[in-house]
């Protein structure tokens, strides 16, 4: 996750960068259930409104939660599917509140009303993220259910009335990019605390719909708008909205280039130190995933690669064990190839999102086709052939993944 507002603030109010020693404890994103009342086009878990066999039992989930607490992860995000559809969500969340420093809920928002909204407030979640992918019918088409927009908006308002910090999550595609200005206005009108723009990741239904990914021009236009909006908040103009992006760490380099054009060299050098201390893509390093079956992955999109299962081995042991793919992800620099391997900004970006490269080439270290930076911006040769996105036409037409 690229915290645009945070790093913009470093240009105005600089603080020393914090250099991590060794591998940090990860933020854990835990998919508690695959069941969901929506059918989103980008869903990486391919969720549906049915029961899925093999999900963690209440006892297994409690045991895993205690291990996470002892491991002292910096943050725990409870997700799904739709986590509010898991019967023991609030029991788990109440215990998690006592065990973790930061506790967040990732929801489609349609169920955060009435008594359930009261329970969310009582638990004391630090943050509730609600997904909205367009205004009105655009969101409903994206999420597969008519009325989903109004229900999610009701969830946002329920959170705000109860004093819960709430954010909107928006996945950008070619179909909804034009509505980004309206969504930012919605944040201002509703007093939303955070806006999270997610770039499309080619996992689950997101892979099947990868042909609808936003092209590079749309992505650059969206980033220009987000930077301008973050600047308003940094300068004390309008509603104070925190801006973050995810799943395309080229955003950090794009922002760095914007800073070069608008701030003195000394401030830009300070910003780069902070961005290098952050390091870009955090899969297998600062982010971990436990899926609904209890399988552990480098992040939520790495379902093709499993480190192990918490049904057999505690998460803490799996994460600190000798897994070869985790070891490769933690290398700096990473063993990147193609355009990413030749890029001058690997220390900032970390190689971007490896899953897009994996889906198109079978190689987790190939270049990321969603990098929208030009050859001049990356310092790469102009004659390097770009990896382009082929629309999905079936699994048998994609290369099989090859890991270490």
Curated annotation (Swiss-Prot):
Disulfide bonds: none annotated. The keyword 4Fe-4S applies. Residues 22-235 form the Radical SAM core domain. InterPro entries: Aldolase_TIM, Elp3/MiaA/NifB-like_rSAM, HemeD1_Synth_NirJ, PqqE-like, Radical_SAM_PqqE_MftC-like, rSAM. [4Fe-4S] cluster 1 binds at residues 36, 40, 43. GO terms for molecular function: 4 iron, 4 sulfur cluster binding; catalytic activity; metal ion binding. Changing residue 43 to A: Contains half the amount of iron and sulfide per enzyme compared to the wild-type. [4Fe-4S] cluster 2 binds at residues 340, 343, 349, 371. It comes from the Bacteria. One of its GO terms (biological process) is heme biosynthetic process. Binds 2 [4Fe-4S] clusters per subunit. Coiled coil: none annotated. Keywords: 4Fe-4S, Iron, Iron-sulfur, Metal-binding, S-adenosyl-L-methionine. Gene3D superfamilies: Aldolase class I. Pfam families: Fer4_12, Radical_SAM. Pathway: Porphyrin-containing compound metabolism. Its cofactor is [4Fe-4S] cluster. PANTHER family: PQQA PEPTIDE CYCLASE, RADICAL SAM DOMAIN PROTEIN. Belongs to the radical SAM superfamily. Involved in heme d1 biosynthesis. Radical SAM enzyme that catalyzes the removal of two propionate side chains from the intermediate 12,18-didecarboxysiroheme (DDSH) and may introduce the keto functions on rings A and B, yielding the heme d1 precursor dihydro-heme d1. This is Pre-heme d1 synthase.
